[in-house]
């Protein structure tokens, strides 16, 4: 039984390959080109490393599909005022979608990645996604949109590892990753500057408009709604008698809505594009949710109605950004499901 390991050239995917090989698994490397090389092409270095480890490497070109399924929706989301999460979309459509298909095409039964998350077997639910043990690197949030059937074929060797230990074990083996530095937040956005990326792509974005308080008072002008995210404080460019936060975006009237800290209190959010990883009838009444990465889970009650998730927080929270992911957990850190945030509770 062959396991294909998605090889980016970085520390995590390389150690995932090393671990599986040392466990006696039959493995091969699989590298996907998601974006055209703009500088140094990592493939020769990845191939050399695989040769050193005695592993075959397969390279698949997915640049056109990545543009269609990840980059284009990313740009379209900003055009309508959303704050997209391209990594979650990439996991669902590319890594565990088309790349997993490519793994099957080369004869692999499973696809392993360097994600910091765990997969467990449950007597009723089958494969269950669970948070990784390293709280600083846990990536279960980004995996909550991956269909259950795809997770059944996934392997996460690093789920029980911490990043510092991974680096140390590679060093102990005298293995240097081809790309030893941490990858940037969004792989296709140079320097993580999404504003420059959108401008370079000549995306038609909403222009300047008024900044209005929650009481209806105009207090300034914004540079374009696409440049702001719900809950944002910095970058408003307004001197005011109290700190101001973005509390909403009125796309129809091109208005940026701001208010003080008290205006941030949101009772919950609604999510669409729902992905159930555990049958909804098995969800507990009280769950934990995350509405942004690196956030401590929030106690909430979540209902599924008409294909949408309605999350009501136990304590009011800053508003959830439209386009981000709502990930739902039980108290044992199993991921019950996820969705794309549509807006606040009605």
UniProtKB/Swiss-Prot annotation:
Enzyme class name: transferase
Keywords: ATP-binding, Cytoplasm, Disulfide bond, Nucleotide-binding, RNA-binding, Transferase, tRNA processing, tRNA-binding
Disulphide connectivity of cysteines: 90-187
GO molecular function terms noted in the UniProt entry: ATP binding; tRNA binding; tRNA-uridine 2-sulfurtransferase activity
Residues forming the catalytic site: 90, 187
Source species, domain of life: Bacteria
Listed GO biological process terms: tRNA wobble position uridine thiolation
Region (Interaction with tRNA): 137-139, 292-293
Subcellular location field: Cytoplasm
InterPro entries (alphabetical): MnmA-like (IPR004506), MnmA-like_C (IPR046885), MnmA-like_central (IPR046884), MnmA-like_central_sf (IPR023382), Rossmann-like_a/b/a_fold (IPR014729)
GO cellular component annotations of the record: cytoplasm
Catalysed conversion reaction: S-sulfanyl-L-cysteinyl-[protein] + uridine(34) in tRNA + AH2 + ATP = 2-thiouridine(34) in tRNA + L-cysteinyl-[protein] + A + AMP + diphosphate + H(+)
Keyword Nucleotide-binding: yes
Record Gene3D superfamilies: Adenine nucleotide alpha hydrolases-like domains, HUPs, Translation factors
Site for Interaction with tRNA, residues: 115, 324
Listed EC numbers: 2.8.1.13
Positions contributing to ATP binding: 6-13, 114
Known role: Catalyzes the 2-thiolation of uridine at the wobble position (U34) of tRNA, leading to the formation of s(2)U34.
Family: Belongs to the MnmA/TRMU family.
Protein known as: tRNA-specific 2-thiouridylase MnmA
Natural source organism: Nitratidesulfovibrio vulgaris (strain DP4)
Organism phylogeny: Bacteria, Pseudomonadati, Thermodesulfobacteriota, Desulfovibrionia, Desulfovibrionales
């Amino acid at each position: 039984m062959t396991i294909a390991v998605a090889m980016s050239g970085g520390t995590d995917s390389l150690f995932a390959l090393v671990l599986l090989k040392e466990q006696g698994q039959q493995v091969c490397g699989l590298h996907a080109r998601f974006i055209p090389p703009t500088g140094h092409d990592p493939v020769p270095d990845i191939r050399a490393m695989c040769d050193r480890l005695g592993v075959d490497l397969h390279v698949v070109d997915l640049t056109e599909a990545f543009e269609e399924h990840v980059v284009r929706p990313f740009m379209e989301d900003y055009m309508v005022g959303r704050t997209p999460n391209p990594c979650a979309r990439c996991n669902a459509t590319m890594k565990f979608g088309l790349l997993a298909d490519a793994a099957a095409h080369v004869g692999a039964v499973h696809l392993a990645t360097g994600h910091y998350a765990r997969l467990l077997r449950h007597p009723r639910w089958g494969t269950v996604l669970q948070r990784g043990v390293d709280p600083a690197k846990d990536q279960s949030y980004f995996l909550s949109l991956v269909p259950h059937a795809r997770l059944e074929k996934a392997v996460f060797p690093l789920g029980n590892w911490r990043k510092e230990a991974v680096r140390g074990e590679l060093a102990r083996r005298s293995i240097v990753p081809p790309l030893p530095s941490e990858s940037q937040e969004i792989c296709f956005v140079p320097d993580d500057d999404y504003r420059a990326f959108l401008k370079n792509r000549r995306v038609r974005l909403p222009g300047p408009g008024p900044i209005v308080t929650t009481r209806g008072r105009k207090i300034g002008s914004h540079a374009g709604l696409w440049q702001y995210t719900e809950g944002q404080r910095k970058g408003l460019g307004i001197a005011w008698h109290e700190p101001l936060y973005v509390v909403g975006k009125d796309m129809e009237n091109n208005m940026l809505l701001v208010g003080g800290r008290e205006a941030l209190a949101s009772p919950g959010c609604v999510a669409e594009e729902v992905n159930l990883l555990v049958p909804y009838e098995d969800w507990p009444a009280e769950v934990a949710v995350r509405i942004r990465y690196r956030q401590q889970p929030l106690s909430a009650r979540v209902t599924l109605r008409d294909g949408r998730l309605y999350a009501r927080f136990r304590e009011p929270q800053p508003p959830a950004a439209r386009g981000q992911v709502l990930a739902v957990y039980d108290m044992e850190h199993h991921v019950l499901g996820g969705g794309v945030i549509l807006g606040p509770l009605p």
